[in-house]
Regions:
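Ubiquitin-like/PB1-type beta-grasp interaction modules and other compact soluble beta-rich domains
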Residues: 1-131
């Protein structure tokens, strides 16, 4: 799991590696496994990521409703051996998506009004084998 706090943040990218993730677990469960604090919105408390490790601050994002790109939001990316070595935006939310052996997942903070909604994670995944 990769957490990229965005280009305007002074926070370092967080990278957590997992080897034995049960296939019945969702990507949302990876937050608990990594000891990262995650908050959902009031509408989707375990389905839409609003805040990771206190970012953005409660003053910036109240997490009552689903934030828009104009307000600032987290973008969710995945990659796995069948996709090659590049990132793609996930077509599913974290509560539905299942981790893939050898894959990576990334969360990128998109600053409101920045126009960088297509920005990829600031981390290059390396191929991994699965047992």
């Amino acid at each position: 799991m990769v957490i990229d706090f965005g280009e305007r943040s002074d926070r370092e990218v967080i990278v957590r590696d997992y080897t034995d993730v049960p296939t019945e677990k969702s990507s949302w469960d990876l937050f608990a496994a990594s000891a990262l604090k995650v908050e959902g919105t009031s509408n989707y408390p375990t389905g839409f990521v609003c805040r990771i490790e206190g970012w953005p601050s409660a003053q910036k994002q109240d997490c009552l409703d689903t934030p828009t790109y104009a307000e600032g939001t987290w973008a969710y990316f995945v990659t796995n051996p069948s996709l090659g070595d590049g990132w793609v935006m996930s077509g599913q939310g974290a509560s539905i998506h299942k981790p893939v052996c050898g894959g990576y997942e990334a969360w990128v903070w998109i600053e409101g009004g920045s126009g960088d909604s297509k920005r990829l994670p600031n981390y290059t995944p390396t191929p991994r084998s699965c047992q």
